[in-house]
């Protein structure tokens, strides 16, 4: 898989990234162990948060699912802030160090809520109407802990990938690190969703969260231990600044006449701006006293280069395609929470002595994604290339991901309809509200959504790296992450809307129609796929001339 990410890894490389000779392979174990520990710590509590809120804070199931979506969205959106802070002000190493410490404080505070009874409401039977609600102080401590944990995790997630790749000079070595980065992330995610979640539910919450504290502390100590070996990159300024300059400069010159003469534009390559979005060509239009005698720009907020204008146009062109990610990931975000709720009211026994934790169900998706990323890179894509002579484009891969996503929601709807029929017939396990239906029925849709993610997530990241301006490639991954984060908020808003307009999502889903919710997602997915196909039909690749040489630039996640 090393060759499949070479171009994307090179996008992470920063020119003149070090003021001294350092970095190299000696930094590899420090970076990887840091990633493993911090990922294990964060996902160890985040993946089982719904169950913790229901069992220990007496929250209703739907409310707990919405809280998970809110904080998961925050975790995905914060990497953009971390990336901007690293690029513009501090560099990657300090941002990772501070983020790791913030994450540790959050996890420690969360662990304290399991040790002190005063930080939790009085325990009662789950789903009882007499349960005591948490006080404002208890919620304040809880939300502070979760927020700190999310800020820390978000600040280091993709910044650590950039810092790790910047330790190497050769593109091949950077590609190798990038592969190990994503492999380690998925490995840690799988372990946290199984071992740590199992410890939380079968030993104690304090023991499980204690493991998260230990993992975070290990990651922080290892990262500090390797600090003297790291290559420290220089802050190069925010890549978004030049985009804002184009807007301001074009508005200031809105009355100027657009010229077709290349001499009227500020360009180092002696070219004129393209005809599309001609209004913004004014930003590169030279006027009196805007260029100094040495060729430099007097005021960068009044005059931009042609390249800056074209970079801005590239962002505008790709926005419609990228927006399709919003509804592509929204059903996945909803499925993430609803699947846990479904698992809680299904037979999770696997043999006489083992019970699958509801919070561990998502590991099926993680493992499915891991497996099919390898299948795609090693078998499917090369086979397609032999048949057609071309490698699948990022847009084609994203389109396939759309189809699998829709299929997963449809299968989940069918499974839930079957479960509700069993509930209506009164087939429960003993006197509980758990339907006499194995949770293994949820495995097929979770596998299918994982297959879809193996197509669309790497495809979206590859599309951003290829088509976003070169100055933005180091933060392209965080942009994708922000959109996924927004999806968690849109999923929460959609749940609110469904609750207000229907009776499909009561706190006890045995009396609801979660299957109808999934069918709504299927309809929305089909409409979104149609929108995506229309956008892709009109879209022209910015770097099409290099496609034949870089078709194997498939980002693995």
From Swiss-Prot:
Membrane topology: Multi-pass membrane protein
Highest rank taxon of the organism: Eukaryota
Cellular component GO terms held in the UniProt record: membrane
Keyword Transport among record annotations: yes
Cystine bridges: none
This protein's record includes keyword Membrane: yes
Function text: Transporter involved in a passive nitrate efflux.
Family to which this protein belongs: Belongs to the major facilitator superfamily. Proton-dependent oligopeptide transporter (POT/PTR) (TC 2.A.17) family.
Annotated protein name in UniProt: Protein NRT1/ PTR FAMILY 2.6
């Amino acid at each position: 898989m090393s060759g499949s990410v070479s171009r994307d890894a090179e996008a992470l490389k920063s020119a003149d990234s070090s003021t001294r000779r350092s970095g190299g392979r000696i930094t590899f174990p420090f970076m990887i162990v840091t990633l493993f520990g911090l990922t294990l710590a964060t996902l160890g509590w985040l993946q089982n948060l719904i169950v913790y809120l229901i069992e220990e804070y007496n929250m209703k199931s739907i409310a707990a699912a919405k809280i998970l979506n809110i904080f998961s969205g925050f975790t995905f959106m914060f990497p953009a802030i971390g990336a901007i802070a690293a690029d513009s002000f501090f560099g990657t190493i300090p941002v990772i160090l501070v983020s790791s410490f913030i994450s540790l404080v959050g996890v420690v505070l969360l662990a304290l809520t399991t040790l002190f009874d005063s930080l939790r409401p009085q325990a009662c039977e789950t789903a009882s109407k007499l349960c005591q609600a948490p006080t404002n102080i208890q919620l304040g401590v809880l939300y502070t802990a979760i927020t700190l944990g999310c800020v820390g995790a978000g600040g280091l997630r993709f910044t650590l990938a950039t810092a790790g790749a910047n330790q190497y000079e050769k593109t091949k070595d950077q590609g190798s690190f990038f592969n190990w980065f994503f492999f380690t992330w998925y490995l840690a995610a799988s372990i946290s969703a199984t071992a740590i979640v199992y410890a939380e539910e079968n030993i104690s919450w304090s023991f499980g969260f204690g493991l998260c504290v230990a993992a975070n502390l290990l990651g922080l100590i290892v990262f500090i231990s390797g600090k003297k070996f790291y290559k420290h990159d220089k802050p190069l300024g925010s890549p978004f600044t030049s985009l804002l300059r184009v807007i301001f400069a074009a508005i200031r010159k809105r009355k100027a006449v657009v010229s077709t003469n290349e001499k009227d534009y500020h360009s180092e390559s002696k070219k004129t701006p393209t005809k599309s979005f001609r209004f913004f060509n004014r930003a590169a239009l030279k006027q009196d006293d805007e260029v100094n005698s040495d060729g430099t720009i007097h005021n960068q907020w009044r005059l931009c280069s042609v390249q800056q204008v074209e970079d801005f146009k590239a962002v505008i062109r790709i926005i419609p395609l990228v927006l399709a990610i919003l509804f592509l990931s929204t059903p996945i975000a909803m499925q993430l929470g609803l699947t846990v709720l479904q698992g809680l009211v299904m037979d999770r026994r696997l043999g006489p002595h083992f019970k699958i934790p509801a919070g561990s169900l998502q590991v099926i998706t993680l493992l499915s994604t891991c497996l099919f990323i390898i299948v795609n890179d090693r078998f499917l894509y090369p086979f397609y290339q032999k048949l057609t002579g071309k490698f699948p484009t990022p847009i084609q891969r994203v389109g396939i991901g759309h189809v699998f996503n829709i299929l997963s929601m449809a299968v989940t709807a069918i499974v839930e309809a079957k479960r509700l029929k069993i509930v209506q017939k009164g087939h429960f396990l003993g006197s509980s509200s758990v339907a006499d239906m194995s949770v293994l029925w949820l495995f097929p849709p979770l596998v299918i959504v994982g297959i879809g993610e193996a197509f669309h997530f790497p495809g979206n990241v590859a599309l951003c790296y290829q088509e976003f301006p070169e100055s933005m490639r180091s933060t392209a991954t965080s942009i994708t992450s922000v959109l996924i984060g927004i999806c968690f908020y849109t999923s929460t808003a959609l749940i609110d809307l469904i609750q207000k307009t229907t009776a499909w999502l009561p706190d006890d889903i045995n009396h609801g129609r979660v299957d109808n919710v999934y069918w709504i997602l299927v309809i929305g997915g089909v409409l979104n796929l149609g929108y995506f196909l229309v956008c892709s039909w009109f879209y022209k690749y910015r770097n099409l001339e290099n496609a034949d040489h870089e078709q194997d630039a498939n980002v693995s996640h």
